[in-house]
Amino acid sequence: MASLFKKKTVDDVIKEQNRELRGTQRAIIRDRAALEKQEKQLELEIKKMAKIGNKEACRVLAKQLVHLRKQKTRTFAVSSKVTSMSTQTKVMNSQMKMAGAMSTTAKTMQAVNKKMDPQKTLQTMQNFQKENMKMEMTEEMINDTLDDIFDGSDDEEESQDIVNQVLDEIGIEISGKMAKAPSAARSLPSASTSKATISDEEIERQLKALGVD
């Protein structure tokens, strides 16, 4: 019983209108078919009266045929109007649905805007940016400290490499001679004296090889 008193929605009203329009269209088509049938009968009657020479009957039947054809033409006009109304109803239904969707979207946006505090959102973004900058600065400081720690040993190794390269360029293989030098464990002259002697001899040998007395 509750469904009987339920308020009709827009869709329900449009569906009823479409059903009525379709019923009207079918009725118009039936009427046109009946008129076409009468038209053929009148044409046959006119031909029959013409054969027997009954001019008066031909004239009366011809007037009836003219009126009938006018009525048939009207059915086409009405049918076209009904089709137009059906199309217009569908367009209106589509527009109303779009309007409903837009209304729902507007309400959703309004609710979101009420929940969202622009000032609070801006503050949150600023805090994020500030903390991100702190993190980047901390990371940079840690990297600089690590570079300072490891760069010291690298500098020492690099300095030793430069010294060896210079000695190699003037023909002194100090590393090789150092390997052949007597160790401090043996009862021989001190390491500093051996190094100096080896270095002098090596220099003299290199000079002689170059042809310098």
Curated annotation (Swiss-Prot):
GO MF annotations in UniProt: protein domain specific binding
N-acetylalanine PTM positions: A2
GO CC annotation terms, alphabetical: amphisome membrane; autophagosome membrane; cytosol; ESCRT III complex; glutamatergic synapse; kinetochore; kinetochore microtubule; lysosomal membrane
Membrane topology recorded in Swiss-Prot or TrEMBL: Peripheral membrane protein
Subunit (UniProt): Probable core component of the endosomal sorting required for transport complex III (ESCRT-III). ESCRT-III components are thought to multimerize to form a flat lattice on the perimeter membrane of the endosome. Several assembly forms of ESCRT-III may exist that interact and act sequentially. Interacts with CHMP2A. Interacts with VPS4A. Interacts with VPS4B; the interaction is direct.
Keyword tags: Acetylation, Coiled coil, Cytoplasm, Endosome, Membrane, Phosphoprotein, Protein transport, Transport
Protein name from the UniProt record: Charged multivesicular body protein 2b
Phosphoserine: modified positions: S199
Gene3D superfamilies for this protein: 6.10.140.1230
Keyword Metal-binding: no
GO term, biological process aspect, one: multivesicular body sorting pathway
Gene, per the UniProt record: Chmp2b
Function: Probable core component of the endosomal sorting required for transport complex III (ESCRT-III) which is involved in multivesicular bodies (MVBs) formation and sorting of endosomal cargo proteins into MVBs. MVBs contain intraluminal vesicles (ILVs) that are generated by invagination and scission from the limiting membrane of the endosome and mostly are delivered to lysosomes enabling degradation of membrane proteins, such as stimulated growth factor receptors, lysosomal enzymes and lipids. The MVB pathway appears to require the sequential function of ESCRT-O, -I,-II and -III complexes.
Tissue expression pattern: In brain, it is expressed in all neuronal populations with a relatively enhanced expression in the hippocampus, frontal and temporal lobes and in both granule and Purkinje cells of the cerebellum. Not expressed in astrocytes or oligodendrocytes.
Keyword hit for Iron: no
Subcellular location: Cytoplasm, Cytosol; Late endosome membrane
Entry's family note: Belongs to the SNF7 family.
Coiled-coil annotated spans: 25-55
Residue span of motif MIT-interacting motif: 201-211
Species in which this protein is naturally found: Mus musculus
